[in-house]
Amino acid sequence: MKKSILTMLLLLMAMASFAQQRLISGQITDRDTKEAIEQVTIQLLKSDSTYVAGAISNENGLFHVTAPANGKYLLKISSVGYKSTIKRIQIFDNKDLAMGKIVLGAEAIMLKGAVVTAMAQKVTLKEDTFVYNSSAYRTPEGSVVEELVKRLPGAEVSDDGTIKINGKEVKKILVDGKEFMTGDTKTALKNLPTSIIEKIKAYDEKSDLSKVTGIDDGEEQTVLDFGVKKGMNKGLISNIDLGVGNKSRYNMRGMGGYFNDNNRFMLFANANNTSDRGFGGGGPGRGFGGANGLNASKMIGANYNYELKDKFKFNTSLRWNHSDGDIWSRRSSENFMGSSSSFSNSLTQNFSRNNSWNGNIRLEWMPDSMTNILFRPSISWSTSDGLSGSQSASYNKDPYTITTKDPLSEEGIDELDKAGAMVNSQLTNGITYSDNNNIRGMLQVNRKLGNKGRNITFRVDAKYTDNDSKSISLNNAKLYLVQTAEGKDSTYQTNRYNLTPSKNYSYAGQLTYSEPLWKATFLQFSYKFTYSYSKSDRSTYDFSKYAMTGDHEYRGWDSYLNPFAGQLGNYKDEDLSKYSEYKNYTHDIQVMMRFIRSKYNLNFGVMIQPQRSNFIYDYMGNHKDTVRTVTNISPTLDFRYRFSKMSNLRVNYRGTTSQPSISQLLDITDNSDPLNISKGNPGLKPSFTQNFRLFYNNFVQNHNKGVMTFINFSTTNNSISNKVTYDEKTGGRITRPENINGNWNVMGAFMFNCSIDSAGVWNLNTDTYLGYNNYVSYLSLDKQSDSQKNTTRSTTWRERLSFSYRNNWLELSLDGTLNYNHATNKLQPNSNLNTWQFSYGPSMTLTAPWGTSLNSSLSISSRRGYSDSSMNTDEFVWNAQLSQGFLKGKPLTIMLQFYDILRQQSTFSRAISATSRTDTEYNAINSYAMLHVIYRLNLFGGKDARKGGPEGPGARPNFHGRPFNGGFGGGRPGGRMF
């Protein structure tokens, strides 16, 4: 009996010891908002500040950390943007310690330096929203948000400013949830300084209609929402960056803004002739390819937001852009033709000049809690000028296997002609001009009918576009395999002047209604009628019988047309002139079911689209006045399952019916260009495309582990492909649209990022992409041969891996990218490709307490697997930047940048399709140095804010402040012209 009692006592003591694990717990809240704060770093330290254990607060602000033994400890709590706090605690008798609520106050914004001790996590995921913490990405001094976006996991930024997040193109930029420069993502990327940004959110935003009705219209847009740092959204902010460099490079930028509770006004100016490339350091996206051509641009933009909470929202933006381009390119192509190939080379010089104005307004009024009125007008005006000149040639054999000379040089052409490889050669010149005016508007009124989800919406849209364009084209061609009666190679020329006025307008009315069937279940109905009209009336004047010469300059029409003054009408070619008029009547009828549950949302439905079209066409002596009636069907399904606030699964399906254009259906042959003849096909069927997407993400608090994966699949039945008939004698081709089956593609991606340690000092990020494309097309070798179905299968693997270390004054990273492409061609197995492109290298950011900052990156980029040995190259691209802050608070920064110090960056690209392989090389200035002078003046409102302003991304503790980022640019095109 005594043994039993003793055993029970020992068991109870053991259970008590297990129950009391010296667990320290609590909840972190914001002093001002009283809301829980997630992602707060909690560190348990010994009395001598030695690290013991750590944790991160969850989405409810809760945390727990276990003490290894009884004793006295320090509990350090820190988060970017908040004052750090240290609690002295004591654990005794192995008891747990409940801290209760721990309140954090916002960090005072110091111009002399923000006191930040924790290393912020790089990315978190909340359902289908990616939240990037800008302070975790250290960008060079003077940089704008483009440099920040390039460093984000899953992000891609192309040379033209196109942004992709997890494979989806970003269509809109928001600042603090408000629209910014509507319709223009580039202005934000090139002008917003990184140092005012606290967080970036990436998510799919529903359309204006979907937001108020809940009806999924398939018009979602991927957006980036830049959150401004606390304390910087009240007062004045300004940043001026003036940069000049060698090789006549310049890059200048100015930005100013005024913020208060309800108003936000921002003004930008930018001028550069560096393609606004920014600093080339850091990030795993480095590799082959500099800027394509020489480009100069100037921009002035303004954006204004006003908001009266729950009552009124007003956004407007105005933008002026001017650009000059000088693009020289050398192109080499192989065109797959049946069991053989044709080859072509070209040398092209293009000059361009563009001028545009754009204005947008978004006005939203909520007169009461049941009504929402939205009005969106916009207007734009633009002109563009172009000059072009090119030399090209076609061959029936690979020219590089016959001659070592340039295949476009006189010596090379003579050698190829003697070998019987020449098919044709051409010299072309052209001048173009266009003037485009556009105005559009949208009015939407939504009314809730009770509180159960019943609502009705009426919407009208209208658009008007007027365009005038002119062009002169001169072409001289030589056919080496077609002989004249005298036994010489055939030649011909075309000299034409085109005037093309066009007009387009449309209007639409839409009614939507949502009816609650039972709890959280809705039946939604939408009807939309659209009328669209377009007219084009091209007048073509043919001077092919005469030699035309003139001044090859912008709008230099008169110098070419003066010899024909007063008699221009006599040269109008009625056959080559083309008139077209198009009227389209469309009815969209959509029915959807919507289920809303605590764990999942489900939408499914179908849209039926009856369409009637009237087409009038006069061309090549043919007059057509035809009417077509078709019906398109588009089923859709969208399912979202919410595992938690940090984990989300989404499945999306959409089917789309597409009709061939009426011009494709007309049985007309267009032989205005003898080397490029096109035909219509009245037997074309509509195509049906099915798109499937699966998306999953999860975020684990422990070590900030983030996981994202998605799979996209697309297939098209009765896809429309051009059947190409190649003429071996002339090198010309005849194209005719045909239906074909077998076009499909699948792609998948996996992203993983984590902090290796609890303090976020060591980090790992990886992106994996796999894609497979099955391209099909028709090919035939001559007019007598039956067309053959050609299939090109392409497999792509892309990998990006980044490993980094960061502390208060230093960040080191090792980045690597891998691109593998395996392409097979059914009819041309000799053209199969297994190519590798990989890039890797270190980057460093170092900041000293006295305001000196050093950035350096080295990228080793390699190509392997190309049949042309000259393509299998290695490039060492080294960029560096040194900056120093001056004056009290460091408002002035002097910065020196060095681009491509080793002068090895190339401008080569390759494109592959079912019918061809094309390699292109561009002109560019990639290697230069630039000196920047940056000054900022910031006056923030509020008691704490008046003390100063926070550091930029990657803030370091106790360092005296650094200025905001910037840069200006522009330049006059130079280069060659034929």
What residue spans do the PLM features occupy?
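Short, ordered, surface-exposed loop/turn motifs in non-cytosolic proteins
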Residues: 32-46, 125
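Conserved C-terminal beta-signal and adjacent last beta-strands/turns
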Residues: 798-820, 832-978
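Face-selective signature of the C-terminal outer-membrane beta-barrel domain
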Residues: 317-319, 358-384, 423-616, 704-716, ...
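Short Pro-Gly-centered beta-turn/loop motif in secreted/extracellular proteins
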Residues: 37-38, 64-72, 80
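A short, amphipathic beta-strand motif
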Residues: 22-30, 61, 100-102
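Extracellular/periplasm-exposed beta-strand and loop segments of Gram-negative cell-envelope proteins
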Residues: 280, 288-294, 327-335, 342-358, ...
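Membrane-proximal, glycine/serine-rich, low-complexity loop/turn segments characteristic
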Residues: 20, 60-64, 76, 82-85, ...
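Short, acidic Ser/Thr/Gly-rich low-complexity loop/linker segments typical of extracellular
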Residues: 47-62
